[in-house]
Regions:
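N-terminal membrane-anchoring alpha-helices
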Residues: 1-25
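Non-catalytic C-terminal accessory region of glycerolipid acyltransferases
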Residues: 2-6, 96-204
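A secondary-structure boundary/capping signal
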Residues: 28, 67-68, 84, 114-116, ...
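Residues at the C-termini of beta-strands that transition into short coil/loop
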Residues: 30, 69, 89, 151, ...
């Protein structure tokens, strides 16, 4: 798996901020495979969620994120690509992004995704604002890799300097869904995934 120098630089600069200023606490890192591909699916409360989600896994793991296509303007697109992200068109089924994610997962990469699709409205805590997207589960099923749930807390209160927390859980059981119609299997796998994410979030 190729390593991104830009990702390493961002991680080094972020380390004292997250662990010093925000006292980042992480548990369950052993649930995320180090060598094999996987899909890491997390709740989404802030644009800063990728920050505490990825740093506790570094340097053993560099996450590959889907970045909304609206961010792909020069020179920001160069930094995004250098950090290992790839574009996705939000609000529509992006076949190219899905195929890219499946290929990367099969190659041993950890694909980070947010099934809620967008950040939650302020004040929404437990209920998901909209029907969760099935893309994360679909990618895990098609790539035949583990589907790992995760949850972050505190990224919506950065100005208050509240402590950041992240938890990673054991892989969601989806082996019994493989071989079924992909669309139907993805819906069931997503339901299981969101239950696990809610449980992790409640434990933080």
């Amino acid at each position: 798996m190729p390593r991104s120098r830009a990702y390493n630089v961002i991680a080094v600069l972020s380390w004292p901020i997250l662990y010093g200023l925000y006292r980042l606490g992480a548990r369950g890192r052993e649930s995320v495979p180090v060598e094999t591909g996987c899909v890491l699916a997390c709740n989404h409360v802030s644009s800063f969620d990728p920050w505490p989600l990825g740093l506790p896994l570094w340097p053993e793991r560099q996450l590959r994120f889907m970045a909304k296509s609206e961010l792909y303007w020069f020179p920001l697109n160069k930094l995004i690509e250098a950090a290992g992200a790839f574009p996705v068109r939000r609000g529509q089924r992006d076949t190219v992004a899905i195929e890219t994610a499946v290929r990367l997962a099969r190659e041993g990469n950890a694909i980070a995704m947010f099934p809620e699709g967008t950040r939650r409205s302020k004040g929404l805590v437990k209920k998901f604002e909209a029907r969760p997207r099935t893309g994360a589960a679909r990618i895990a099923l098609e790539a035949d890799v583990p589907l790992i749930p995760a949850a972050v807390k505190g990224t919506d209160r950065l100005l208050r300097l509240e402590r950041l927390r992240v938890a990673y859980g054991p892989a969601v059981e989806i082996d019994d869904l493989r071989g079924r119609d992909v669309a139907e299997a993805a819906v069931e796998a997503t339901a299981r995934l969101m239950t696990r994410i809610e449980e992790l979030e409640a434990s933080l």
